[in-house]
Amino acid sequence: MSAFRFRSAALAAAGVLCLLPPSARAAAGGVDRPIDGTPQLRRQGTATQLVVDGRPFLILGGELLNSSSSSLEYMQPIWDRLVAQHLNTVLAAVSWELVEPEEGRFNFELVDGLIREARVHQLRLVLLWFGAWKNGLSSYAPVWVKRDPKRFPRVQLDNGDTPERLSPLSLDSAAVEARAFAALMKHLRTIDGREHTVLMVQVENEAGVLNDSRDRSPAAEAVFAQPVPAELMNLFVQHKETLAPELRQAWESNGAKLSGSWAEVFGPTKPKEFVLTWDLPEPLRQTEWRKFHWPVDEIFMAWHYARYVNVVTEAGKREYNIPMYANAWLQQPGGAYPGTYPSGGPVFQVADVWRAGAPGIDLLAPDLYVPEFGELCEKYVRAGHPLFIPETNRSPRAPFNLFLAVGKYNAIGFSPFGIDWPFSGPPPAVPASERGGAPNPTLEQSYEIMRQIAPLLLQHQGTDRITGFNLDKDNPSFVTTLGGTEIEIGLDLAFGRRAEQGFGIVIAVGPDEFYGAGAGFCVIFRPVGKTRRGVGTVDEGVFRDGKWIPGRRLNGDETDQGRSWRFAPSGLAIERCTAYRIE
């Protein structure tokens, strides 16, 4: 028990501030920092943006395979491939085991080399600190940590096994890791404090307990039997109205108690006879992953993981205060129960617990590999919280999800995983005649389009002048108002044939002036009262250095004879449209 000392209550009390919407946090001295060129998060309307050198920055990223960045020689041929994919940012792992191979001896040659090559190739970096946990395990901890389980206690599973997983309840482990992370951040400030090649740092990777719902070690069980810390109870009492519905329901369904042990406040733990399974039969596969199973176990672990991560994060921020985030392996149809995904990680049900326990973390980022992309984005932007997608599939759906995340949910960035995998190149082009009216853009094409429109998009993010969307047969159209103009956006229709899928972003830059980007959709200007609106002019074109360069004037079939503003499914495009009014 001696290794599992309690943390300072003051740290968590400060963390309750993080539950507030970002605008309120800024007013209370929370999230926003002075503008000095250092990367920071800043509010613009309802959006939170990443600001670098005083300007908003949209991360068009790609995450390297886990081991790629461990060798500068291995990376040499990869850099040019990354540039060719129109990335502006690379997410690269930096591991505790290589930074501190011997206790107290730090080696930053690899970090220096990554930053040097990124600058040569005009790329930015987000560094991923693989410390105590990577995918719930502790494989990236130094060997001198692994061989000393007495000093660095491990999680114990319900079967008595103590796998290679450091326990988050150990303050000694947190303090030792925090020392290494602080050394890294101090070094980054020294070599990158002016150039700002490194935009953000991810602290740990997909933390949480696998193969059980919580730590069952004697020390952890002793803490589990004690009262819930007052600072965590304050979260439920003082911020009940803004809690995630799943978290609030878990507390209220157990009587909304104001004190007691973890089980008394949050309900029963995982039953002993329950066997975790990754494969569920239908329809359980579609329903169970949306439920909050054994809330007490996940809340208990979330609190302690968040507190541990905050010790590490705050140590780093004292040296160099740039945005830091924690990512989440999500509950999903293929892993519905805590332990089939890392229990206690920053999944949406316990995100508020993380924000309270880890006030140093600037945002919680979902790793999105599931079809329910928009549904889960919605969970993470609840109450105005910022969104970043650090991992996702590099699949034909990636362009669709990119436009949705950035245009609708104000994401600060998007980053498919395995961007350097030799076999993860763009999917082969499918002839339009074989696609059945479905767009088939590559990620490279989508990033190039997004790069062109980024200045305009970032200018209007957080306002009522922008929308992003995905369309399909189940959701073929919707009506929205942009800058006071009511429009209907639907699947493209031409020659009696409707597109099967569509995606895009539309921005109103004036009362009757619009820009759009995407494929497979059309826009109709709706009448308001006696005022009719119609398509005035449509030009396709490009942005060069932020300036609009028009190309073809589109009319006739390309505008359905003036009835709609069209984006054909045959290819990605940027277009400018003006509308006219008849009173």
Language-model region placement:
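Active-site region of glycoside hydrolase catalytic domains
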Residues: V120-Q122, K134-G335, A356, G360, ...
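Aromatic- and carboxylate-lined catalytic core of secreted/periplasmic carbohydrate-active enzymes
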Residues: F403-T531
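N-terminal carbohydrate-binding accessory modules
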Residues: A27-N88
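Bacterial N-terminal signal peptides that target proteins for export
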Residues: M1-A12
